[in-house]
Amino acid sequence: YGIKEDEIVFVYVGRMAKEKNIEELLWYQKSVQKNIKLVLVGDGPYRTTLEEKAKEYQVTDSVIFTGMVSPDEVARYYQIGDLFVSASTSETQGMTYDEALAGGVPLLCRKDDCLKEVVTEGKNGWQYENESMYLECIQKWKEFSEDEKRRMRNTAVRTADQFSKESFAKRVERVYLAALEERKRRNVYAA
């Protein structure tokens, strides 16, 4: 893809649909330094529109659309990323967040309730609410030493371990069991 060694790579993996708000990432790309590439991995009904927006915003030199990739290649794309970026506020399960973290890729995501238990600001990523916050997070990343970046990547992996499918299933099970216990308790008192 012609990515240079000294370039910072932001990677997005997922379906290209309007509700994913990828257009925001393209808009912000106008404001970032020229040594940052945005790699958009995936396909979907909104891809053509996004490619047109990239031209309109004059960011085609710094944005790469990979198209659909096979599931066994996805990990490779996470690995080229310095940060995983997402502007979506419509995630319910957020598997791509987990995949990025598992690959040691810190997150830079639009603030979303589904991430409040996942993102620890400045430790495994950041959440932003607007363009200035987005740019501020990028500046922090750029100012980190290699050791700080390594620590952040390691924390990302530990976070993914904590939120793996197994631990997610156990958390859901605890919630259901607590709900059943509460229901039982209420039925006892109702009788």
Which residues are covered by each model-predicted region?
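A charged, aromatic-enriched C-terminal amphipathic alpha-helix characteristic of glycosyltransferases
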Residues: 150-185
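Nucleotide-activated donor-binding/catalytic signature segment of Leloir-type glycosyltransferases, i.e.
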Residues: 51-69
